[in-house]
């Protein structure tokens, strides 16, 4: 059975079990989702762990009875009468939103029914392996003005072996969770009460990690012919009216007044880059022009969807806008794809998924422009030998796009690079260049990011490596520990030498026991731990331990330096 149908059926059984145990609970919705399912309930009390165990037991009883899923068609009025009688207020609200004349319900054992499009399994006995996972709060329809419901998450698979493997992966994901590891490792924190939700504070180690990523970005962009620009974080509301963001994106924008004039905290960088493009007349000989910025943007996200570094209200992205001629378009797309693939490998991601989203029903621009841009995106992918999935009609209204999602160590997908054609902004800002015939011509505009949001990418890195970052990215690469105070001067001598070579070194000469200090360094995921005592002082060597591995033994300083340099180059 396909997993969507299986999980949807399991969600139905979950709702039936809850209604049998707590008849007063009101039903919300219960779809299948990626990796599982959920069901929302209106209940005064939150479900406890003991409640979840009871619900699982009741679900198993329903499954063991092998009750049939029976579909019935009702007209809209009949359905409203039925759910009014059952006092299922949220089902009535759903029916008010339905425009069709007919709706379907599913029954099991003539005891339980639910408003549902289906499909379902033929009977409950087809559900072989399931598990309830967690409880959370969720606003009805995701709106904070609506009642808060209680959401039960679960998952289901066709076999117990698949379920066991999935639960093992979930446990590993918890161990790697960047929301836990990030603060533990001293990378970042989010001070919800003091400063606000979704706003990231980088601690010293996190700031070093971010700067290393930024340095890589700047070096690689300049090497590839990009020009760096920087724009203000605020600008007049008029700019956003002209760009169209005010009409389409206002609810996600931070808007305020200064001296009776409206200003906006920028949610995107593109209008600012366009103003720089417009600052002088451009010739076809100047194109392509590639403006790049590590641009911080601010977007209002509802508190319910904020999630560590993955979904925040202020973030920085490696944002670039390319202005080119139609003839240059495919070449620019190909160059961006090369950049993305190389960057993924540099940071240790070897697998990714590519999606091409094409023209939606409602779009702006000329059909011929859409066809040309889509063809350029497709041909670039094919010429690089990259497999991709087409999402018909899923492009933005202003242009087709490529999305590249990286796969981490647990095979989870993370949104990363985007290459987006834009037919709207060049028209709104009346962009032009002088072509070979001396005529004003509209340039093609590409939005693109390589790593995307640096916050999200750092979250992905932490989880991919379970916090143990590769040596070149580690905020502290080496920590030196003298066994006693009398060996501290020798430890400082080694530190100074490694410092002078550009390595990131810490000295731990605290009075704690050596084992305790080593354990602390292991928890901090510091790649190399050096211990120095009398023997090391006499021989001018260091005792080397690699984090997560056994003692590597004694090395000369030259051997250690060579090893570190080679590992950084890898």
Regions found by a protein language model. Name each.
Residues 1-26, 32-570:
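NTP/phosphate- and nucleic-acid-binding module
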